A protein has these predicted regions:
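Extracytosolic ligand-binding ectodomains
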Residues: 2-9, 13-14, 20, 24-445
C-alpha cells in the first residue's frame, strides 16, 4: 500500500504518544526563518483536515498566496490503483482524495458486519462492527472477507486506510496521517507529502462481538440499505466529492462481488449541508422514510451533533468517515455510532509535533467556534504546552465561521506576532488567509 514516501510511526499509550521512527526529508529546519536575509519575519502557517486541500488554493488567483503553508489530515498513502478506481467514479477528483479511503472502508465494514449478523437491522449487526476490524483472518477487500465469513470464519478487514483495529468506542486504534505542503501554484505538492502511522493495535477492542449467524440464513429477508449524509453544499462541500466517490465505489464493488444477504446493497444519496442550514435534519428524515439501515456521514462533527440522537435512537447505524471530535469517543450512542476517522487526540499530536519540530517558539491558533474547531485547538495547545511551550506563548482565538469580516481576529494574530499560526476551519479559511496575507502574517512569500 505504501509508495516509498517518508513514513513515520507514532504509538499511542493512554494520552501519550511516542515517536518511534523519524521520517526523512530534511525538514528539521525552522521554516519560520526570515527570507532572503530580510529582517521581516516570515510566519509559518499551518492548516488541518478541514482546509488543507487543493480546493483552498482555488480561492486564490495570485501566485504564491499559499506557498509553504503546511498542514495535517488523516490520509493514507493510497495506491495508484485505488485512486484510478476512484477517478473512474468521479474523473473530476484530480488530486483531492481526502477521506475517500475512510468513506470506502466505512461502507465495507458496515456490509461485513451485516453479513456476519445475517441481518440488515442495525441493532442486530451493530455489535459486529468492531470485530470485523481485528482478531480474525486477515483480508484486504470485501470479496476475500466474504469468503472467510462464508466458511464460518471471522474476518479482520485491513482496508485501504490501513489496519483499522477499532477500539471499544468504535473508532480506529491505528490511523495514518499525511503532512502536506502547498507549492507556489497554490496546490499541494505531492512530492512533499509525508505519511505518519499513529496509534497502537494493542489498544484495539478485545471483544470480537457475537458469534456469526449461519451464513445464508439472512438471504431474502431484506436488502442492506445505506444512506449518504455527506457535504454536497456548505462550508465542507470540497470534501464531498472524494467521500461520495469512496462510498459509491464501495457499493459498486460490493454488488459486483455478489452483494450482502443475497441481494445488492441499495444506496440512497443525501446532502448534509452545514450548520448554517437544517439540510442534515431534512436528509435524515428522508432517509428514515426510505428505510435506510445505515447512514454514512456526516463529515462535520458539528453537523453530526445535530442529528446523531435522531439517527441512533431510531435504530439506524451512523458511520462517519471524517468526524474527529474527541467528544464522540464517550458519546451515548446506543452502540450505533462508528467512525473510520481518528479522533483529534491523534491529529493534535501530529500537528503539534510538526510545529515544534520546525522550531516555532510561539503559536497563535485561529479556530472556528464549534465542536470541531474548539476541540482540535485545545488538543493542539495542550500538546504544544506538553512539548515545552508556555501558556503565555500559545494563544487560542475563536471566530464565527459565518462572519462577513475576519479583520478583528487576524489583528489579534498581528498583535501576537507569533512564529506560527494554525488555522482550523473549513471553506472560510480562504477568506481568513487572504486577510492574513494582506496584514503580513499569512503564508504569501
Amino acid at each position: 500500500m505504501r509508495s516509498g514516501k517518508s513514513v513515520r510511526t507514532i504509538a499511542v499509550s493512554g494520552a501519550a504518544l511516542l515517536a518511534l521512527a523519524a521520517c526523512g526529508g530534511g525538514s528539521d529546519d525552522n521554516g519560520g526563518s526570515s527570507s532572503g536575509g530580510s529582517d521581516e519575519k516570515q510566519i509559518n502557517v499551518y492548516g488541518t483536515d478541514g482546509n488543507v486541500g487543493d480546493p483552498l488554493g482555488e480561492q486564490f488567483s495570485e501566485k504564491g498566496a499559499l506557498e509553504g503553508m503546511k498542514g495535517t489530515t488523516p490520509l493514507t498513502d493510497l495506491s495508484q490503483e485505488f485512486r484510478d478506481r476512484l477517478l473512474k467514479v468521479d474523473p473530476k477528483l484530480g488530486n483531492t482524495f481526502n477521506y475517500a479511503g475512510e468513506s470506502y472502508d466505512a461502507v465495507v465494514i458496515t456490509a461485513l458486519a451485516s453479513a456476519m449478523a445475517q441481518s440488515n437491522q442495525a441493532t442486530v449487526f451493530g455489535p459486529y462492527v468492531n470485530g470485523v476490524t481485528f482478531g480474525g483472518d486477515k483480508c484486504e477487500d470485501f470479496k476475500s472477507c466474504m469468503d472467510i465469513i462464508a466458511k464460518g470464519g471471522n474476518p479482520d478487514y485491513d482496508g485501504v486506510t490501513g489496519p483499522l483495529a477499532f477500539a471499544d468506542p468504535g473508532e480506529p486504534a491505528v490511523a495514518s496521517f499525511g503532512t502536506l505542503q502547498f507549492g507556489p501554484d497554490n496546490k499541494l505538492d505531492p512530492d512533499l507529502t509525508e505519511y505518519l502511522v499513529v496509534g497502537d493495535e494493542e489498544n484495539a477492542a478485545t471483544n470480537e462481538g457475537p458469534a456469526a449467524a449461519p451464513f445464508g440464513s439472512g438471504d431474502g429477508k431484506g436488502a442492506l440499505k445505506i444512506g449518504m449524509l455527506l457535504p454536497l453544499t456548505g462550508s465542507l462541500a470540497f470534501l464531498g466529492p472524494p467521500e461520495v466517490a469512496g462510498v459509491t465505489l464501495a457499493v459498486n464493488e460490493i454488488n459486483e462481488a455478489g452483494g450482502v444477504l443475497g441481494a445488492p446493497v441499495e444506496l440512497v444519496p443525501g446532502d448534509s449541508g452545514d450548520t448554517s442550514t437544517n439540510i442534515a435534519t431534512q436528509t435524515v428524515a428522508s432517509h428514515q422514510q426510505a428505510g435506510v439501515n445505515a447512514i454514512i456521514g456526516a463529515a462535520s462533527s458539528d453537523v453530526t451533533k445535530t442529528v446523531i440522537d435522531t439517527v441512533t435512537q431510531a435504530g439506524i447505524l451512523m458511520f462517519s468517515p471524517a468526524n474527529t471530535s474527541d467528544s464522540f469517543t464517550t458519546y451515548a450512542d446506543n452502540g450505533l455510532y462508528f467512525r473510520t476517522a481518528p479522533p483529534d487526540i491523534m491529529q493534535g499530536q501530529v500537528l503539534a509535533d510538526l510545529i515544534t519540530k520546525e522550531g516555532n517558539q510561539s503559536v497563535g491558533i485561529l479556530a472556528q467556534n464549534g465542536e470541531y474547531g474548539t476541540g482540535l485547538a485545545q488538543v493542539i495547545a495542550d500538546n504544544l504546552e506538553n512539548a515545552g511551550l508556555g501558556e503565555d506563548v500559545v494563544k487560542q482565538v475563536y471566530y464565527d465561521p459565518n462572519a462577513s469580516d475576519f479583520s478583528d481576529v487576524v489583528q489579534q494574530m498581528v498583535d501576537l506576532n507569533p512564529d506560527a499560526i494554525v488555522v482550523i476551519g473549513f471553506d472560510e479559511s480562504g477568506r481568513i488567509i487572504q486577510v492574513m496575507n494582506e496584514q503580513g502574517v499569512g503564508p504569501a512569500r
